[in-house]
């Protein structure tokens, strides 16, 4: 009796439930579509793709190298260390501007790669951010102390580094960064823009505990890096015909503060706090549209520091490169 009473009070119909789900989906899709086509751009220059769903397959490779030199208690030191290149494969999808992706690192799955790296990019019409964090024990290279050169192998030095660049796009109505780097927009006509930016690079390299245990007589070295830069640059999207898009961006910033330090066996040497030096942020991309549905391309982002000081000199080069193919569905 109770079941019969509940069925009378709360009638259930599979068709009615399906209708509710369909109405909710239609409403959500309408909201997403309105939001998707509400553009801050001049549509003579930048438009949204017509497909509701964009699928993309992407291969990426990243690398990082650091050169340093300095003098501590009359002992001259120099080094060149680089990480193993990280290769990932990802597949992603974006529906009306909402995106998700999944990445795998084949070398890590096989146990050959223990490093960790996170790269984040945010592209709006006015403001853009590129950020990366890397933790690596795959550093290798040479360290020289006076006349003695030591070969550093994997697991003998540790690196942690954080890079971030934020910039403002002045010609934000006609110049679109997203068109070149995530294909969420299409640049219809060539345009460029001046940029104002802020950059920071920070982190350290130090000899690992494993090396200290295996070679206790070797010098214990730590290199601390921190640069804050302010500057400006220019970016340009060149549209060739209706199929090609080429982007080149250069954003140099001037170092206004640093905390660079070299430590050998507990003795430290600091760089001048307000030394005049530079950080360079470069971008390049090529996108080819086979049709309104299919596209492919290459892109790269690099962050370089050029810091020269009589006490401590540090050059860092962090880069990431992508190759991708994609398709748009459901016009």
Describe these PLM feature segments.
Residues 53-57, 100, 118, 127-131, ...:
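Transmembrane beta-strands of outer-membrane beta-barrel proteins
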Residues 58-62, 94, 103-107, 134-136, ...:
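Outer-membrane beta-barrel pore domains and translocons
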Residues 119-223:
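Outer-membrane pore/translocation modules
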